[in-house]
Amino acid sequence: MAHASNSRIKVGIVGGTGYTGVELLRLLSQHPHVELTAITSRKEDGLPVADMYPNLRGRVSLAFSTPEKANLADCDVVFFATPHGVAMAQAQELLAAGTRIIDLAADFRLQDTATFERWYKMPHACPDILAESVYGLVELNREAVSKARVIGNPGCYPTTVLLGLAPLLENGAALVDTQTLIADCKSGVSGAGRKAEVSTLFSEASDNFKAYGVAGHRHHPEISEQLEKLAGGKVGLTFVPHLVPMIRGMFSTLYARIRPEALGTDFQALYEKRYADEHFIDVMPAGSLPETRSVRASNNLRIAVQRPNGGDLLIVLVIQDNLVKGASGQAVQNMNLMFGLPESAGLDQVAILP
């Protein structure tokens, strides 16, 4: 499906009933260059979207439909806010029709098919399409994203870890010990999705704080693969995710040991220079302590750099809204770049406080 730059982008969403799906609807319904044409859900076929999500009353007039009824091949781009495995099953047909794909699941995140199959317990349906897909972290892959037909939208934890560590590793930087990196990450419960699950029941998640996936989490290989691309070699990463009793928000505390020859580096200046031209990345003043509420419902990601007592340990604090910059907002940012629009189109919402 060819797209004329002076017309609105025809957008379809597969899997519009989960949290990332409704977040896509919220953002795209306000986008000045988008026409929402299809939102699919087999279970809710025929139900008006606004009946399920009353925050969209007056904004989205569509009803959910099955993928067969939705004519997705008539769209310029289709977002998949679905479980792993769905996008790759439909990718060939959509690409043949000229429709571009942005997958918010993991089908096109990991370039190594064996790694994908080991962690997601399914064969990859289209290794040829995977080979041409682009990892959609705009701040690291801007040029490739702009030319892509298929985007693997990054996971929420990887977004914070990669953007938090990139200035220390990219372009041959030899600033920190790449074998002892630590990512201590916390997420609100919306990151687990909308499915019924005991661990995210109110009585389980409220007034509670716990680690999970310590022995192995699916985002670990994704983070490692991208860090190794940045560093140009193997990295050692300890990644520990936690669930905290809030709905939205992610806070990642990253630890890196400074190499002896880099002890004189001004790391605050390094980060400020690296992200000076990035619309959504805010490097906070030295000594800052970011709070997740400062990015709630926005596409901003904030970074604070700390070096306790001027020693050899660098601590990088990173916050984002896991549903926006960590998922749907980042997907829209990718779409904007793919269609030659300003990256901030439809994404300049100010965070909500309190």
Curated annotation (Swiss-Prot):
Keyword DNA repair tagged: no
Biological role: Catalyzes the NADPH-dependent reduction of N-acetyl-5-glutamyl phosphate to yield N-acetyl-L-glutamate 5-semialdehyde.
InterPro entries, per database record: AGPR_AS, AGPR_type-1, NAD(P)-bd_dom_sf, NAGSA_dehydrogenase, Semialdehyde_DH_NAD-bd
Biological process, per Gene Ontology: L-arginine biosynthetic process
Catalytic reaction list: N-acetyl-L-glutamate 5-semialdehyde + phosphate + NADP(+) = N-acetyl-L-glutamyl 5-phosphate + NADPH + H(+)
MF-aspect GO terms: N-acetyl-gamma-glutamyl-phosphate reductase activity; NAD binding; NADP+ binding
Gene Ontology cellular-component terms listed: cytoplasm
Protein name, per record: N-acetyl-gamma-glutamyl-phosphate reductase
Keywords attached to this entry: Amino-acid biosynthesis, Arginine biosynthesis, Cytoplasm, NADP, Oxidoreductase
Cited CDD domains: AGPR_1_C, AGPR_1_N
Coiled coil: none
Pathway membership, UniProt: Amino-acid biosynthesis; L-arginine biosynthesis; N(2)-acetyl-L-ornithine from L-glutamate: step 3/4
Residue positions of the active site: C156
Keyword Cell membrane recorded: no
Localization annotation: Cytoplasm
E.C. number: 1.2.1.38
HAMAP family named among the record's database cross-references: ArgC_type1 (MF_00150)
Database matches in Pfam families: Semialdhyde_dh (PF01118), Semialdhyde_dhC_1 (PF22698)
